[in-house]
């Protein structure tokens, strides 16, 4: 019924829009191309996708920006500072460390204020395991297609009371129907360093200060050493990190697929700290019966190894005597310098910061597997009526070890220390 010469606009969620000039034809056959890039008008709201203008709650959707993403060890780094009302505070800044996420501030003084995290339709347990305190650390940032944040109380209508602090919905990348097999590699190298040091006295300044304050013949002056040690320089380093990802994607008949593996190795600027992660993901999305039956299978696995540095070494480096050496050959403490009085270790004295890092070994190893299968069926006699089934699991195990020998300033009094702890969790949907 459109008049001749008029322009007909055709659009659909997930496809490129087309404008067609009516030449007077009685019938038009229009084929829309899939558009996986333009997602500004589409948001995921828990039970499907809608246009942003049709969403009734407070919703923010973003896509990861490869051109301006910075150093992204975890998924948390990708949204930090990019969504209004979402505040992220990292726990110490070590590679792979946890983070506190708050959507529109905290709502409880005693209960949890953590938002609910949903990955490909599967709610994830917010309780971390040994080695991975942040559930967003378990997913490879390279696999993420979109973030959607539900900020207000309307999210509780979908997910219940768990969503009272907001919801972070993560949609991972998928293959494209009918596309040819494609293999891609994405890699980067990063360098991290501290920008400045805490201003403290150098060795000569400290000697002059002690001499002027207590006198040249005082016992305090006799305790001074002959070295010139920059303790902050001894514990910090320029850290190098690498990230590698290989992806195979395509569409086999009516079954789009995507398989990816990733490896991340990030050293911390505090010596001995290190985060290493292996990830793998599989997505299959076959459709049957002229797209009336759609199946979406997702599986993501992660293995991480984390070496924790003793952050107490930072305070010790600021306070330690710069005239003392890092090592003095004392076998009682593994060769490291330590304060003594008449040959006895002074337990209340500031400990050697380098020894705190090198002689304390605290490591965590964790494994995580998240998977779900969604089955969606549109009835032939009434396409608006759908049956949807979502089955999923979230399994994780984490082990943390701590050890320092008795021949160390840390372990001299306690005759050394060793510890071991394991946490397992299993959740089914």
Name these PLM-found stretches.
Residues 290-295, 316-365, 378-394, 400-415:
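Glycine/serine-rich loop-strand microenvironments at binding/catalytic pocket rims
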Residues 178, 268-281, 296-302, 308-313, ...:
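Small-side-chain secondary-structure face that scaffolds active or pore-lining regions
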Residues 1-302, 310, 370-371:
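Short, small/polar-rich motifs associated with maturation and membrane association
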Residues 62, 232, 356-360, 416-420:
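Short coil/turn segments at secondary-structure junctions
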Residues 193, 197-198, 203-214, 302-344, ...:
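A surface-exposed, glycine/aromatic-enriched loop/edge motif typical of exported proteins
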Residues 237-255, 261-264, 347-402, 421-429:
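Outer-membrane beta-barrel transmembrane strands
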């Amino acid at each position: 019924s459109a008049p001749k010469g008029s322009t007909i606009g055709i659009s659909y969620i997930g496809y490129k829009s087309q404008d067609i000039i009516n030449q007077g034809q009685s019938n038009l056959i229009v084929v829309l191309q899939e558009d996986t890039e333009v997602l500004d008008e589409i948001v995921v709201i828990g039970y499907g996708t809608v246009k942003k203008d049709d969403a009734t709650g407070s919703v923010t959707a973003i896509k990861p920006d490869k051109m301006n993403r910075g150093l992204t060890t975890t998924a948390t780094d990708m949204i930090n500072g990019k969504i209004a009302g979402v505040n992220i505070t990292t726990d110490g800044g070590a590679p792979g460390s946890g983070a506190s996420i708050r959507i529109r501030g905290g709502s409880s003084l005693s209960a949890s204020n953590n938002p609910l995290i949903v990955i490909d339709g599967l709610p994830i347990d917010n309780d971390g395991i040994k080695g991975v305190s942040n559930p967003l650390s378990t997913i490879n940032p390279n696999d993420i297609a979109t973030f959607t944040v539900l900020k207000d109380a309307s999210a509780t209508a979908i997910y219940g009371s768990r969503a009272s602090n907001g919801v972070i919905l993560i949609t991972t990348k998928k293959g494209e129907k009918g596309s040819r097999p494609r293999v891609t590699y994405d890699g980067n190298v990063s360098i991290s360093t501290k920008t400045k040091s805490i201003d403290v006295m150098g060795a000569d300044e400290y000697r002059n200060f002690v001499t002027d304050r207590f006198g040249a013949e005082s016992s305090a002056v006799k305790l001074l050493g002959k070295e010139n040690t920059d303790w902050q320089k001894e514990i910090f380093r320029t850290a190098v990190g690498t990230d590698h990802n290989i992806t195979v994607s395509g569409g086999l008949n009516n079954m789009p697929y995507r398989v990816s593996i990733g490896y991340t190795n990030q050293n911390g600027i505090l010596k001995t700290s290190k985060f290493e992660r292996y990830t793998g993901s599989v997505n299959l999305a076959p459709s049957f019966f002229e797209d009336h039956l759609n199946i979406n299978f997702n599986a993501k696995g992660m293995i991480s190894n984390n070496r924790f540095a003793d952050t107490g070494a930072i305070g010790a480096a600021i306070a330690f005597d710069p005239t003392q050496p890092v090592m003095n050959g004392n076998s009682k403490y593994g060769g490291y310098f330590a304060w003594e009085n008449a040959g006895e270790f002074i337990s209340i004295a500031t400990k050697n910061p380098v020894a705190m890092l090198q002689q304390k070994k605290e490591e965590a190893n964790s494994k995580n597997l998240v998977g779900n299968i969604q089955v969606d069926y549109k009835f032939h006699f009434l396409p608006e009526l759908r049956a949807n089934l979502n089955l999923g699991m979230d399994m994780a195990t984490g082990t943390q070890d701590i050890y320092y020998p008795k021949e160390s300033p840390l372990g001299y009094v306690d005759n050394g220390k060793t510890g071991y702890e394991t946490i397992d969790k299993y959740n089914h949907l």
